[in-house]
Amino acid sequence: LNDDLGYDRMVQDMLAADELAPLDRSRLRATGFLTRNFHLFNRNYWLEDVVEHTAKSFMGLTLNCCRCHNHKYDPLDQDEYYSWRAFFEPYQVRLDPLTADPSPDAPAISRVYDADLDVKTQLFIRGDEKNPDAKRKILAVVPRIFGDSAAKTAAVNEVRLPVTGWYPALAPTAVAEAARAIQERAD
C-alpha cells in the first residue's frame, strides 16, 4: 500500500509470488497470506484455513458449511469446495533464512511453494479427513458462480524456477553473507 501497489498485483503476489518473483524477498513476503495459519502437524487443517480465507477475501463468501455438506445458503456445493481446495493442494510452506546465522531463532521468511503438482485432492465425507471418498476425482475448477465460461477445469502447469528459488542459500547475496559471517568468526 505504501508503494501504491495496485490491488491486482497485491493479490497476485499473495497467491503466487513464489512463481512470479521467486528471488524477490519483498514480493515473497506476500505469500505470508497463505501461511499465516500454518499447522505443521495437520496439513488438512491448514488447507481448510487457506480455502476459507481466500474465499472470504477474494469471493466474499464463507465456505465453512460446504466443506462437510451442501448447504442451502452457500452458493457453492461440497464438490466446488474441494475443487477450490485443489488449487492449493500442491502448496507447502518453508522458512528461507535471511542471514547466514544457522540458529533456529535466526530471521527467516515464511513462504509457500508448489511441492507436488501431481498431489490428489480428496473429498472428505462429512468433512472428516479420516473418511476420504476414494471414488471421486477432484480437479481444480473455477466455481460456477463466476459464470459458465469460468466454470471449467483450470490447467495447473509447472513453473520452472531458478535454482536459487529452490535453494536460497545459493543466491549470491546469501553466499556473500555466509562468507562475511565466516570471516567474522575467523577474525
What does each model-found stretch correspond to?
Residues Y82-D187:
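Substrate/cofactor-recognition hotspot
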